[in-house]
């Protein structure tokens, strides 16, 4: 077995001996610095590839302070304020960290700010309000009594939010606040290209420039107590300035409004059905950002180095699943791996030479402290991500943070050594081939490919009570033997043939969100295309409130193919008699007690006559199966990630696709164990996803089977005979 390569480790000025030791122990072939660390010159000639973290928008306060007009900016909306009698005063910075932002009253506030009557939804004329700079407040002289008002305004980001986060989490003392500057603007643009060339001249030993990242940070706001106030890993509200917005107006031919970004205070988060204007803005940003990225990567290539992009931080506008990214010149992608979905978020990116996953835990004091258990976190991270790697591998793995902290935990060092060796073996066995896929599955939502593998993600891989029952579907798919695609409603509208070749469609989420479609179902072309796909023999799985939107006598617009509807009160007058359960169904055959954990589930779902209810609780349907024309629909109220739920989804997809007969092909009877086949490479593996020994019966591609015992987390490799 190869014991060297495909691993990147962090270093620091005071960690040279430790770095040299782990280069050998972990078989690492690349070294990197991190935020808050420096690269020691003693390691230049180790033979390892050297990554240098490069910040395009910060770590140069001399420039930032000399050019305050080109500091990065963000759109912010105040809370709602209710008018009574007389004038209404709205303070702008309430709930916002003054270390993080300051009001931009330098640019024309009448043009770039907006005061909105939230009771009517109408913006106020600029003459109806004025700004009091002394109190940093907007005053509405004659508001309508008991109407609610908000102010949307531009603010300068005077402390880079990521640097602020790192400073707060690590309790850094005496560290100068790094001010982010806007590379899109003329002076800083020219300076940035000069600065990059000078950096490359002075760092000839660097092999890979690890851009962290490019130009605009995702939306990250802190309050006065340095607490996280608002976060959206996909948020575009910090990618704005009058300079950028004037360019946008010229391109699209209509006037910009702050509301295009503010979106009633929801900031166009991925649960909101995106407006035309917001989609226009994103497309504009993608084109502009990709062009500027190409300038920088061309410079890097001219110096004979590789350009790597960190998937995160200042990555807004990069959008690696969209076509503009292919013109950016980026050689490699590295991203943080929190679970299987975030692994696929990296490994599925097309058009780069290689991808790398930065595994957890990060070597920071929040995990590496007395009483901390980094081994447990590392095990959970690796075993969770491994499912996805076995479907679509990244090319490299790595770690980040303070190496000396990790070295205080010898058991952690031992475990990571085993991970590195296992990854190399895994990669050698599956590289260059597509694993066996049982079916082609497409997740249908408003975002399509743009949010591939990131559906239902508010912050990077973090749990949310309101969405874990939906995110579990995406997580299950990340390591399942399916060819998974992501399709948008716009794709269907443009060409219904996009559904050709799909076996099963999945629509998952709450009603009137971007994930289920909302008002898009009022478009008869889209509604008919999806229902026609099922009626002609396709499969449909709806989770939560699929197609949820009140329209023309239905709440669930996919009610017909799924055979269920939600009781909103409008149909209480109708009696319902279909409540018999059919827990002996194919889908439930592997479930303990033929029951399922639906997570938060859904209230008030009932089934139409002719629908088979698999599980109902207190006369609320949790799972149902329905024949629709030549096709089939499956309704599930929620499906949090677990090994048994992986199996539930697997069987649901097979049943929806009329393919129950293919169950015993590359299959494990124990749902804690999975089988992955790489027919082109003549290999298959059986993997134990748990922390306990497991016994199973394994079925191969020809339907033959054998019994197998696996140790904790064990993976066994076999050759495909014949």
Predicted segments, located by residue:
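The substrate-binding groove and active-site-proximal loops of carbohydrate-active enzymes
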Residues: 5-12, 28-34, 99, 169-190, ...
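Polysaccharide-binding and catalytic clefts of secreted carbohydrate-active enzymes
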Residues: 69-327, 345, 431
């Amino acid at each position: 077995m190869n014991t060297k390569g495909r691993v990147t480790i962090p270093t620091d000025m005071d960690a040279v001996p430790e770095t040299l030791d782990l280069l050998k122990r972990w078989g690492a072939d690349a070294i990197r610095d991190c935020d808050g660390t420096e690269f020691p010159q003693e390691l230049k000639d180790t033979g390892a590839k050297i990554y240098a973290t490069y910040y395009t928008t910060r770590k140069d306060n001399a420039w930032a302070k000399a050019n305050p007009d080109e500091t990065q900016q963000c759109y912010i909306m105040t809370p709602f304020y209710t008018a009574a009698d007389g004038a209404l005063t709205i303070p702008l910075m309430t709930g916002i960290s003054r270390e993080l932002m300051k009001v931009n009253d330098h640019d024309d506030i009448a043009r770039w700010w907006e005061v909105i009557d939230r009771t009517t939804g109408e913006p106020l004329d600029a003459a109806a309000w004025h700004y009091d700079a002394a109190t940093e407040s907007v005053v509405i002289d004659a508001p309508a009594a008991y109407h609610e008002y908000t102010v949307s305004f531009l603010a300068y980001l005077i402390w880079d939010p990521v640097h602020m986060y790192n400073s707060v989490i690590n309790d850094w003392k005496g560290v100068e606040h790094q001010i982010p500057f806007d590379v899109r603007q003329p002076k800083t643009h020219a300076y940035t290209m000069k600065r990059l060339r000078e950096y490359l001249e002075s760092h000839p030993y660097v092999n890979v420039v690890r851009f962290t990242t490019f130009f605009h940070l995702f939306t990250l706001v802190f309050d006065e107590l340095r607490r996280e106030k608002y976060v959206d890993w996909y948020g575009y509200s910090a990618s704005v300035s009058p300079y950028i917005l004037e360019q946008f107006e010229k391109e699209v031919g209509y006037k910009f409004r702050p509301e295009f970004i503010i979106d009633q205070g929801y900031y166009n988060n991925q649960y909101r059905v995106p407006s035309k204007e917001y989609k226009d803005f994103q497309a504009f940003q993608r084109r502009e950002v990709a062009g500027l990225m190409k300038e920088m990567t061309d410079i890097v290539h001219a110096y004979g180095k590789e350009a790597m992009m960190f998937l995160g931080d200042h990555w807004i506008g990069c959008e690696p699943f969209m076509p503009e990214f292919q013109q950016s010149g980026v050689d490699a992608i590295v991203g943080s791996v929190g679970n299987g979905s975030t692994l696929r978020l990296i490994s599925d990116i097309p058009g780069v030479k290689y991808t790398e996953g930065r595994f957890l835990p990060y070597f920071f004091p929040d995990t590496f402290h007395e009483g901390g258990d980094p081994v447990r976190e590392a095990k959970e991270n690796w075993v969770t991500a491994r499912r996805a790697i076995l479907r679509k591998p990244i090319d490299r793995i790595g770690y980040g943070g303070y190496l000396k902290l990790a070295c205080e935990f010898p058991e952690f060092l031992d475990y990571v050594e085993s991970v590195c060796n296992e990854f190399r073996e895994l990669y050698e066995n599956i590289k260059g081939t597509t694993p066996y896929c049982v079916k082609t599955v497409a997740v249908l939502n408003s975002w399509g490919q743009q949010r591939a593998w990131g559906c239902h993600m508010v912050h990077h891989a973090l749990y949310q009570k309101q969405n874990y029952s939906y995110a579990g579907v995406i997580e299950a798919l990340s390591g399942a033997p399916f060819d998974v695609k992501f399709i948008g409603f716009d794709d269907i509208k443009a060409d219904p043939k996009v559904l050709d070749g799909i076996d099963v469609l999945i629509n998952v989420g709450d009603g009137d969100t971007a994930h289920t479609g909302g008002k898009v179902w009022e478009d008869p072309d889209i509604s008919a295309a999806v229902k026609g796909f099922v009626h002609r023999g396709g499969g449909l799985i709806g989770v939560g409130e699929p197609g949820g939107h009140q329209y023309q006598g239905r709440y669930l617009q996919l009610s017909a193919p799924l055979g269920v509807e939600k009781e909103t009160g409008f149909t209480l007058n109708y009696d319902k008699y279909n409540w018999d359960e059919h827990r002996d169904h194919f889908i439930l055959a592997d479930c303990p007690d033929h029951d399922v954990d639906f997570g938060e589930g859904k209230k008030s779902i009932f089934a139409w006559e002719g629908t088979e209810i698999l599980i109902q609780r207190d006369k609320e349907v949790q799972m149902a199966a329905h024949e629709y024309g030549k096709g089939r629909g499956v309704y599930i109220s929620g499906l949090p990630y677990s090994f048994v739920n992986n199996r539930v989804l697997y069987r649901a997809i097979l049943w929806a696709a009329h393919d129950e007969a293919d169950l015993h092909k590359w299959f494990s009877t124990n749902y804690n164990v999975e089988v992955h086949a790489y027919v082109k490479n003549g290999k298959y593996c059986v993997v134990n996803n748990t922390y306990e020994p497991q016994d199973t019966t394994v079925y191969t591609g020809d339907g033959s089977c054998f019994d197998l015992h696996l140790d904790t987390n064990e993976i066994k490799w076999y050759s495909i005979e014949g």
